[in-house]
Amino acid sequence: NAIFTRAQLENLVARVPTTFSNLFIDDKGIVYSTTMGTHTDAVKKHNTAGGNMLKLQTYQSDSLTDLYVDSEGIIYASVHEGYIEVFSASGELIFEFGSNAFDMDVSGLYSSLPTIAVDHNGNIWTADGDKGYLQSFQPTDYALMVYGAMELYEQGRYEEALEQWTEVLKLNQMSVLAHNGVGKAYLHAGRYEEAMEHFKVAGNREYYSEAFWEVRNTWIQAKLPVVTGILASLWLLSFLIKKFDKKRIVRKAKKRFIHKLFTVPVVKDVLFACKIPRHPIDQYYNLRVSRSGSVAGASILYLLFFILFMAYQTGKGFIYQFKDIEDMDINAIVIGFAAILALFVICNYLVTSIKDGDGSLGQVYMIPAYGVLPAMVSMAIVIVMSYVLTYNEAFLLTIIMAIGIVWSIINIFLGLQTVHDYTMKETLLSLVITFVFFIIVTIITLIIIIMWEQLWQFLKSIGTEATRNVLH
């Protein structure tokens, strides 16, 4: 009471640590535990500081009741709903089996599963929590083969482990554990490209990055003289042109080419975006007085931005690519992109019209298009660099994207300020009101859509009922 008020004490959330549902101590004295009510670190292998030595990257049940660890370090865990999960000594999920059934007495099914144990022959013993009968499971040839491969790898017998994992793959070609095992064996054998193939199938980006680092080093050492020679040749060519091209024929030809590009109105309007990042205030002033830019050029830039955004989402290197285009709803993305853009433009135009802004609807439409070039360049750079960087160099991509996004936001802010002839305070206020208006319009639109769907279902049901009555 000396520190907190009564209201603070009432609202204070009790910091109660999660409790273990069970403990196990193996032959080496290492303590293992299971925790209920969490999907992270539900199975723990404790070090002397109490931390978890396992790296469980797979989804774990939040109702683990018991566990057992055999002499090889393999972890067997029971789930209250009747499932049995088996993990490797390092925490990789090997397999899961079992199910829940309250009204059936079927082998392998449980009403609840409170405990588990394993004998010296590798047989799993369980007890049904409600019905009270024991069930035992004998390891299959496939399971024994997996256990054997893991044991060989832990003993450092990588060639023998590779042979064993290869046999496992013959039985199950999509086994993530087997592909990881083959990849690790290849990694220790120095067969990095083959290791990358298996890590890619297994979705193991950490080890893929490790193998890729070795492949990249080998490529750099082999190609560095060639790359250096090409760069030196280009520098020498540039030097010779500057020295012997006294009449500047090459430079004039380049200028003529650029001039021809700028004589094409649409191309000129698109390339106008390149001037914005360097001098945003001056160039947005030119846009304001209708000297530069066009709705057509802005539309092309929006299209290019959308294409780059989709490539950024789906086209990065394996290490940094977490989405597949098959898992994306393209129609929803296209509609969402168009809706957000349209709402921002309309809301900002309406707000600035009330707040005495000078910008027209077309100019408000053009401002974001000409301001997002740094973000577009950043996305293009990240896409390319994602194929040559490893996990440890991810911070470079983060910095590049952050620079591009911040630069683009500054451009758009200055564009709104310049085109509407606002002060900084007025621009901030107009943006706040724009986003509030944006949210209100979005909520109203969603309500209308939901009500229309309900009305349509109601009318459809009436039509169906009327048709049924007429026919009968």
Please state what every model-predicted region is.
Residues 1-179:
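Eukaryotic scaffold repeat domains enriched in small/polar residues
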Residues 154-155, 188-189, 222:
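Register position in tetratricopeptide repeats
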Residues 212-231:
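Juxtamembrane/start-of-transmembrane alpha-helix segments at the extracytoplasmic/lumenal side
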Residues 187-209, 235-236:
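TPR/TPR-like (Sel1-like) alpha-helical repeat modules
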Residues 258-362:
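Selected alpha-helical membrane-embedding segments in polytopic membrane proteins
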Residues 331-335, 344-450, 454:
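Hydrophobic alpha-helical transmembrane segments and adjacent short intramembrane/lumenal linkers
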Residues 174-178, 203-218:
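Boundary/linker segments of alpha-helical solenoid repeat arrays
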